[in-house]
């Protein structure tokens, strides 16, 4: 990398590029001297790279802003081009709805104001344009209130830029900035503060409790107003331009041209509730709230940090996580060395966990945060590991109130995190969970972590890791292997079923075809033993052959999948097939999930069969004590919607190729027609058309391009047919899913006249101090330590939690079918209010 590029990238950092100095002023002066000369040689390379640095290392924006201010003193044309590029990029970001670019570029423009590069009045115009758009959006008559998330986002962008230039704006244009803040207050007075209870990390049972709390926009305005009343003084934003103020004041101001905000879709003309809800969902998806604060630690763990400084550090951390997501070590390094004067390890941990647990989904996969936290623990060995451990303990204490989706992610993260540190954890602290009933959330949490660890390592290793709490071995999965029913025992005569299993195994070893196998089964086993025994023999034997490894399993399913398809052509029989798979792998949760997932992948079982099996009696009783049924259900839904997503991508790509083929075919025809219309001499006589060789080539080209276009159109039609079929099946799947949830909940939820909220449900168990029959551990019959919530109530809480989680996760696919779901499932007289509340909170949409 060129020296000038390295200087730009590493400005403000401790490193060899700037010698031993860590002073911002020295860095800026050194970089300015090099960049000034480089602009004369290759200004067209410097400008885009400088902009890229400012956008992708936004915690250094004050440094880049000051550098540009100094360049403005000597090369106004270069800076004018830069300002125009910033404006153009900002407009593109607005047009495309690129949230991160909009926010960062507005911060950058505010910083350029501090360096006397941008005219304050023109920045105020940008603010007011965004604010005007926001106010229009939430206006019932002129706008589309369903798109309030976009309006909120614009206001957040204005407020979030002020820590970087509010002082200068208050000094140079005090009336104008006051007008903007008053306008924001007016906006807040007309917008709706809708419930986001379905996106909360913790659920205390009060469905509308979040309405009484300040939301993110209101809270941010309070922080900015406190900052303004404090003279715009904060510790988290460097102000290097002050060191060059005497020089920068001589710079020429540059004007920002007007901007135009993106228009929202028109509100539904038919006043459809479902369509309005879908628009709101689309807006929330496009303009999601960046962070939901997770207050894990007590206030005394943080230094005396102003609320606005906390906000700025959160911005720094989220920016680094976003822009350096492909360079995890650089990411961790920057996160550990932010340009602030106070310690922030606790705030960093809270921010990271808020992203891991963020609902409806985090910006990145859990694995990314796992690696960043691991690197931070190594970069800050004396501080961060203890903070992370403290966060885990704090979350463990609140695990019974944690959202089910967030709880699952916490389990996945923590088990993976421990695998990076030799599975070391003071398990004796959590050994008390064995005294709790097997359905207690803390006990289930520890159990699921240990089972996940076994997947990431091996049984003996995990047993060794809990040697300080050996009793926890009870929560490990069974060490035994597959549950093969036809194993041969010495000294005992083979049963008829064992003989048939051995014969089937021999045929597999002889590599007989699936067709031959089907004929043999239909002639030998089925007529004598009937369907159930036949299915048991076939499933047990083939799975046993495939049990040696994942590759063996895949090979068996690929080679003999037709046998399963022939035996189980409909959903009823596929449910029985899944039950047999579960029986064979009853000692291995992971292999059960893998086998079922592969069978669905090969279309041996349908997603509807999996839903029916998950909600069958053998699994329903496990809903509150094991994650296995939910994992399998989630895998099936994921695979279903991944297929739809893949089909949509294929259709999009083929559509583009069709347009290209159309153009190529049209051009070929035009060229042929032009050639045919020309006169040429053949043996001295004028003939219509060019020479025969060229004409033959042109005709061949027309034929080939026409065939290519036709082939693509046929492929497009086939994909569209598959998509329509998949969407039709999805509607049936969703109806089955919600009907299944409704059915099992109806059987166990208390009378709706007595229980109308989750808090009511929890209070039932809390009021009853005496252990009931359900408070006895069914494994050994001994009474367990009392739990705040009884088993039946905990089953209801867990099932409602997963109902909310699945509804929220697949909301985009649910909305197109909302009217049918409302009419056929949600509107029945016997629908329990807790069932409707779970779905309403997930969709952020009231159900009546």
Curated annotation (Swiss-Prot):
CC per GO annotation: mitochondrion; nuclear cap binding complex; nucleus
UniProt KW Secreted keyword: no
Pfam families in alphabetical order: MIF4G (PF02854), MIF4G_like (PF09088), MIF4G_like_2 (PF09090)
Record's keyword terms, sorted: Cytoplasm, mRNA capping, mRNA processing, mRNA splicing, Nucleus, RNA-mediated gene silencing
GO biological process, one term: mRNA transcription by RNA polymerase II
Keyword presence, Acetylation: no
Recorded phenotype for the gene knockout or disruption: Stomatal closing and reduced wilting during drought due to abscisic acid-hypersensitivity in early abscisic acid signaling. Abscisic acid-hypersensitive cytosolic calcium increases in guard cells.
SUPFAM superfamilies to which the protein is assigned, alphabetical: ARM repeat
InterPro entries, per database record: ARM-type_fold, CBP80, MIF4G-like_typ-1, MIF4G-like_typ-2, MIF4G-like_typ-3
Tissue expression profile of the protein: Expressed in all tissues analyzed, including roots, stems, leaves and flowers.
Top-rank taxon: Eukaryota
A GO molecular-function annotation: RNA cap binding
Ranges where the record places region Disordered: 767-786
Main location: nucleus
Family classification: Belongs to the NCBP1 family.
Self-association and partners: Component of the nuclear cap-binding complex (CBC), a heterodimer composed of ABH1/CBP80 and CBP20 that interacts with m7GpppG-capped RNA.
Function description: Component of the cap-binding complex (CBC), which binds cotranscriptionally to the 5'-cap of pre-mRNAs and is involved in various processes such as pre-mRNA splicing and RNA-mediated gene silencing (RNAi) by microRNAs (miRNAs). The CBC complex is involved in miRNA-mediated RNA interference and is required for primary miRNA processing. In the CBC complex, ABH1/CBP80 does not bind directly capped RNAs (m7GpppG-capped RNA) but is required to stabilize the movement of the N-terminal loop of CBP20 and lock the CBC into a high affinity cap-binding state with the cap structure.
Protein's UniProt name: Nuclear cap-binding protein subunit 1
């Amino acid at each position: 990398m060129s020296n000038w590029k390295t200087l730009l990238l590493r400005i403000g950092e401790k490193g060899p590029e700037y010698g031993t100095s860590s002073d911002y002023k020295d860095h800026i002066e050194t970089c300015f001297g090099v960049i000034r000369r480089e602009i004369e040689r290759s200004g067209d390379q410097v400008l885009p790279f400088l902009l890229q640095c400012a956008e992708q290392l936004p915690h250094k924006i004050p440094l880049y802003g000051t550098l540009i201010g100094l360049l403005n003193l000597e090369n106004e044309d270069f800076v004018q081009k830069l300002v125009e590029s910033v404006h153009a990029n900002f407009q593109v970001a607005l047009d495309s709805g690129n949230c991160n670019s909009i926010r960062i570029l507005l911060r950058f423009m505010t910083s350029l104001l501090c360096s006397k590069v941008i005219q304050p009045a023109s920045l105020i115009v940008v603010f007011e344009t965004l604010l005007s758009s926001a106010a229009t959006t939430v206006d019932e008559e002129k706008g589309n209130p369903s798109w309030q998330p976009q309006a909120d986002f614009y206001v957040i962008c204005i407020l979030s830029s002020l820590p970087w230039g509010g002082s200068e704006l208050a000094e140079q244009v005090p009336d104008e900035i006051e007008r903007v803040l008053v306008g924001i207050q007016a906006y807040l007075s007309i917008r709706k503060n809708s419930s986001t209870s379905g996106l909360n990390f913790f659920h205390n049972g009060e469905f509308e409790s979040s309405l009484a709390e300040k939301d993110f926009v209101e809270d941010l305005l309070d922080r900015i107003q406190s900052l303004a009343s404090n003279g715009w003084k904060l510790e988290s934003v460097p102000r290097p331009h002050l060191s060059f103020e005497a020089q920068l004041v001589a710079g020429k101001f540059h004007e920002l041209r007007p901007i135009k905000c993106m228009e929202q879709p028109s509100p539904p003309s038919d006043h459809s509730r479902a369509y309005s809800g879908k628009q709101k969902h689309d807006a929330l998806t496009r303009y999601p709230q960046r962070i939901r604060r997770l207050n894990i630690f007590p206030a005394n763990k943080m230094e005396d940090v102003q609320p606005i400084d906390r906000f700025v550090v959160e911005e720094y951390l989220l920016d680094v996580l976003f822009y350096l997501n492909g360079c995890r070590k650089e990411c961790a390094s920057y996160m550990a060395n932010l340009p602030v004067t106070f310690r922030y390890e606790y705030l960093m941990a809270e921010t990271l966990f808020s992203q891991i647990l963020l609902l409806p989904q985090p910006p990145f996969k859990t694995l990314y945060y796992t690696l960043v936290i691991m690197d931070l623990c190594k970069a800050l060995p004396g501080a961060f590991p203890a903070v992370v451990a403290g966060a885990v303990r704090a979350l463990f204490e609140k695990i019974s109130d944690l959202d089910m989706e967030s709880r699952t992610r916490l389990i996945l993260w923590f088990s993976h995190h421990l695998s990076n540190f030799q599975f070391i954890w003071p398990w004796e602290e959590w050994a008390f969970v064995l005294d709790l009933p097997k359905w207690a959330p803390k006990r289930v949490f520890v159990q699921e972590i240990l089972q996940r660890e076994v997947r990431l390592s091996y049984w003996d290793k995990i047993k060794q890791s809990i040697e300080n709490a050996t009793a926890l071995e009870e929560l490990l999965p069974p060490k035994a292997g597959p549950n093969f029913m036809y194993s041969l025992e010495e000294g005992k005569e083979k049963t008829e079923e064992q003989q048939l299993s051995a014969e089937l195994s021999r045929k597999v070893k002889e590599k007989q075809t699936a067709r031959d196998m089907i004929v043999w089964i239909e002639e030998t086993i089925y007529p004598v033993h009937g369907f159930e025994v036949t299915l048991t023999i076939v499933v047990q034997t083939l799975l046993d052959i495939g049990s040696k490894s994942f590759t063996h399993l895949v090979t068996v399913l690929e080679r003999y999948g037709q046998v399963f398809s022939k035996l189980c052509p409909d959903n009823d029989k596929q449910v029985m097939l899944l039950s047999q798979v579960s029986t064979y792998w009853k000692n291995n949760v992971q292999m059960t999930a893998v086998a079922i997932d592969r069978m669905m992948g090969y279309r041996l079982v349908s997603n509807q069969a999996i839903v029916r099996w998950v909600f069958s009696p053998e699994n329903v009783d496990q809903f509150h004590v094991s994650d296995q049924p939910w994992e399998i259900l989630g895998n099936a839904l994921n695979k279903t919607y991944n297929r739809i997503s893949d089909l949509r991508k294929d259709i999009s790509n083929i559509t583009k190729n069709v347009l290209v083929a159309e153009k190529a075919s049209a051009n070929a025809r035009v060229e042929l027609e032009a050639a045919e219309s020309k006169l040429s001499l053949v043996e001295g006589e004028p003939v219509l058309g060019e020479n025969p060789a060229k004409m033959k080539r042109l005709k061949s080209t027309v034929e080939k391009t026409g065939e290519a276009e036709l082939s693509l159109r046929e492929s497009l039609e086939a994909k569209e047919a598959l998509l329509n079929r998949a969407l039709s099946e999805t509607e049936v799947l969703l109806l089955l899913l919600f009907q299944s949830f409704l059915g099992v909940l109806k059987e166990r939820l208390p009378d709706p006249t007595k229980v109308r909220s989750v808090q009511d449900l929890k209070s039932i168990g809390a009021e009853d101090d005496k252990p009931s029959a359900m408070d006895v551990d069914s494994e050994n019959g001994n009474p367990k330590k009392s739990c705040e919530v009884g088993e039946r109530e905990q089953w209801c809480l867990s099932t409602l939690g997963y109902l909310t989680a699945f509804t929220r996760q697949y909301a985009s696919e649910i909305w197109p079918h909302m009217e049918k779901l409302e009419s056929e499932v949600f509107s029945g007289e016997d629908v329990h209010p807790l069932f409707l509340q779970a779905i309403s909170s997930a969709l952020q949409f009231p159900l009546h």
